[in-house]
Regions:
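Bacterial N-terminal signal peptides
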Residues: 7-15
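Short hydrophobic/aromatic-rich beta-strand segments that constitute the beta-sheet cores
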Residues: 48, 75-79, 97-101, 107-109, ...
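N-terminal mature ectodomain segment of secretory-pathway/periplasmic proteins
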Residues: 25-103
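Gly/Pro-enriched, hydrophobic low-complexity segments
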Residues: 148-241
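Boundary at the C-terminal end of the N-terminal hydrophobic targeting segment
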Residues: 16-24
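Flexible, processing/modification-adjacent segments and terminal tails
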Residues: 23-42, 49, 94-165, 240-256
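Short, surface-exposed beta-strand-loop junctions and turns on beta-sheet-rich folds
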Residues: 83-85, 105-107, 116, 185-187
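Bacterial N-terminal signal peptides that target proteins for export
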Residues: 1-7
């Protein structure tokens, strides 16, 4: 009898030791799921154009446009308009961030937390295309968001230098498309959130996504970010992801 009980007790102990997210998430391992969902929107090697409209409580809107190029965990974002913001650029190489000031060759180190271009988009918002690089992920269950059936996840920052130590993310069950994210302060107060307002598909891939960032404390202040002409690439030159590239001033390699 004792011999029969030992395996059962061992199995029960092992089951209790498993984290709830690993045990309950219906689609298996969480990290591969999250990484696949990220890459479904923006492939590991890709380029796209981006337009951002900032709305302020003062009633003055601001518009800028540019492009970004992604190579796995490396991203470069370059403004092409308006003239006052031309050549403003952000470079992310893993955990290293650089900023190029508009209309100059000055390049400085910056951080994920800064909001170099202003508005509701931080440097990390413009260069974070791999969630698991910055956050550990736990499954919280299924929940409706924006009227859609979603998986809800809790993201905890791996690095204290990130602006938001805690994030909640909702991904639509049927499509694996992002629906909403809420960003919290250390004390648990919601600071901002984003909602995906529109997605355009071409066959089985995303070619355009419209995201609205909202200041949770001042909801009249928003940043509307549109990524369009999302194009998968077979190869991306390494030269784009260096400080020297930003300093060169030759920042319009979009057609390669």
């Amino acid at each position: 009898m004792r011999a029969l009980l030992l395996p059962a007790l061992l199995a029960a102990a092992l089951s209790a030791a498993l984290p709830a997210d690993a045990e309950n998430f219906p689609e298996g391992d969480i990290n591969p799921y999250i990484e696949a969902a990220d890459a479904f929107v923006l492939p590991l090697y890709c380029k796209a154009k981006m337009a951002i409209t900032d709305t302020f409580s003062s009633g003055q809107d601001r518009f800028s446009e540019g492009f970004f190029i992604r190579k796995d965990n490396k991203v470069v974002f370059v403004n092409t308009a308006p003239a006052s913001q031309k050549n403003f650029a952000l470079l992310r190489n893993e955990d290293l961030f650089y900023q190029r000031f508009a209309n100059t060759n000055k390049v400085v180190k910056t951080s994920a937390t800064a909001s170099a271009r202003g508005g509701e988009t931080s440097n990390l918002d413009l260069t974070r295309f791999n969630t698991t690089l910055d956050y550990t992920v736990a499954y919280l269950g299924r929940e409706k968001a924006a009227g859609k059936d979603c998986y809800k996840f809790e993201l905890k920052a791996r690095n204290r230098k990130l602006a938001y130590g805690l994030v909640h993310a909702w991904i639509e069950v049927a499509t694996r498309l992002p629906v909403k994210r809420s960003f919290f302060a250390v004390a648990g107060k919601e600071l901002k959130y984003y909602l995906v307002r529109a997605v355009t598909m071409k066959g089985s891939r995303v070619v355009q996504m419209d995201i609205e960032y909202v200041d949770a404390l001042r909801p009249e202040e928003t940043s509307r970010l549109k990524m369009f002409e999302i194009t998968p690439l077979k190869n991306v030159p390494e030269q784009f992801f260096t400080k020297e590239y930003l300093e060169s001033g030759r920042l319009y390699p979009y057609d390669f």
